[in-house]
Design a protein with these regions (language model features):
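Short loop-to-helix capping motifs
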Residues: 45, 106-111
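Solvent-exposed, amphipathic alpha-helical segments
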Residues: 6, 10-18, 64-67, 71, ...
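Hydrophobic/aromatic-rich alpha-helical bundle segments in the mid-to-C-terminal region
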Residues: 114-125, 134-182
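Hydrophobic alpha-helical connector segments
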Residues: 52-55, 65-97, 147-150, 171
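Amphipathic alpha-helical packing segments from all-alpha helical-bundle domains
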Residues: 62, 66, 92-101, 111-137, ...
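Helix-turn-helix
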Residues: 6, 10, 14-48, 52
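N-terminal intrinsically disordered/low-complexity leader segments
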Residues: 1-2
């Protein structure tokens, strides 16, 4: 891992633990165990630092779904188990999920950076293709039309878990969703 990635990870940890307001160049230097001024070399402004963290979040999310094999045919319940497995894997990066949630609110007026966390996130297309493959394997009609909704549902379940809002039975929710599709 390079220094840029190390700084990004430190920023993610800071945001998850202390909130977006804690994201300063000096705090990232301290969190990363780097000499004072190191973060400023890679990110001159606060917005540059936010962009570095946002990009690091995207990189981690893509790594979560790389190399997943989906069987050619599965039942709806098996499809739900596959999606639960993906959800559980992504939820292991709890700091990343918490930081992403905090940044969504912080960046609501910054269209460019917000898009990298939402609709235009580099991971969004591969994740939607993965959802479509799961839906096709489960025999869902119009799988491509339903894939973005499945991604949105998984995203909501991740956010709910990261926020520790309340216990939700993701398996039950996903089974009901998949059984309800035509």
């Amino acid at each position: 891992m390079g220094r840029r990635e190390h700084i990004g990870d430190a920023g993610i940890g800071l945001i998850a633990r202390d909130g977006v307001h804690a994201l300063t160049h000096l705090q990232v230097d301290t969190e990363a165990g780097l000499p004072r001024g190191s973060t400023s070399y890679y990110a001159r402004t606060r917005r540059d630092l936010l962009a570095l963290v946002v990009n690091r979040l995207s990189e981690g999310s893509q790594a979560d779904i790389n190399d997943l094999e989906i069987p050619a045919s599965v039942s709806r319940q098996e499809a739900a188990e596959i999606v639960v497995g993906i959800l559980e894997h992504m939820a292991r990066r709890a700091d990343a999920q918490a930081a992403r949630g905090a940044l969504l609110f912080e960046l609501r007026d910054d269209v460019e950076l917000r898009e990298l966390l939402t609709a235009e996130a580099p991971v969004r297309r591969p994740l939607t293709r993965l959802a479509e493959r799961i839906l096709v394997a489960a025999g869902v009609d119009q799988a491509s039309a339903h894939a973005p909704d499945l991604v949105g549902l998984v995203d909501a379940l991740l956010m709910y878990r990261a926020a520790k809002a309340a216990p939700v039975n993701a398996r039950k929710v996903l089974r009901a969703y998949l059984e309800g599709l035509g």
